[in-house]
Amino acid sequence: MSMYEEGLKLLEEKFGNGKDNVIALATIAQEPSADGGGPQPVVRDVNAYYENGVFYSVTYAKSCKMQQIAKNPAVSIAVCFEWFTAIGTGENLGWVLDPKNAELRNKLRTVFAEWYDKANNEEDENCCILAIRLTKGTLNINHWEKLYHMDFVNKTTMENGGVF
C-alpha cells in the first residue's frame, strides 16, 4: 500500500464512517483588510461529513461563507483537534431537496440527526449543501511521528512536504 493510500485509509477511519466532524473552514473575504491591504482570510467552525476526499456541510446559500466561495472557491480546512489540514475548492451543490442531492441529503440527515432539523429549514431553497473538495492535505500522526502529505488531485504523496 502506498503512503497516499495509507493516508486515505486513515482519513476514512478518522473522519468517515458516518462521523459528524467539526472543521475550521477558511474562505477569502470579499472586502479588503482593515489596513487597506488585500482580501483577508475568514475562518469559522462547521459540522462536516467526510467521504472520498470531500467534506460536506449543510449551510445557507446567502451566508457570508457561501458568498465568499461563489467569488473565490479556494478554501482551507483543519479538522479540529485531529491534526489534519488541507486546501481545496468549495462548491455549492444546490438545494438540499433537489432530487440530484437525495442520496447525499439522506447521509447528511443521518450523520447530523441530533441537530439537523433544529439548524436547517429544508423548505427554504437557500438551504444548500457545500462540498469541500480537497486538493492537498497533510495528516499528522502522533505529533510529527509520521506525516502524510497527500495530493488528492494526482492521487499521490507530495515528496517535498505539504500543507501544515
Locate each region found by the language model:
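Short beta-strand segments
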Residues: D20-A61, Q67-I69, V75-V79, A86-T89
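Residue-level signal for tight coil/turn positions that link beta-strands
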Residues: N52, F81, L134-K136
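Charged, gly/pro-rich active-site loop segments
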Residues: T85, T89-F164
